[in-house]
């Protein structure tokens, strides 16, 4: 099966918690993985630098990210701006998805629906 890639502009959430261990730099690439032992959110997806959690994928889209990773997809995060206030301190980024063509198309549709629903609710 053919592989594809896609990008999704968003943020890394929770920088206010991790700011003592991480100073984000524009262009920095970070790992994204399912956080299986998160007692507060069973869909949590963490953003990591050198295997240390420095933030999380926004809760509104974490379930979609988790499904993508569970089905063999890969996600990386690239910092695109300076931290700002939002839900705590947020760091602007682009999430890079890599996986099977069919799954990429489905994930991007789900992300579009998820974020559209949030904007209008």
Tell where the protein language model's regions lie, with residue ranges.
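Conserved active-site motif detector
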Residues: 1-121
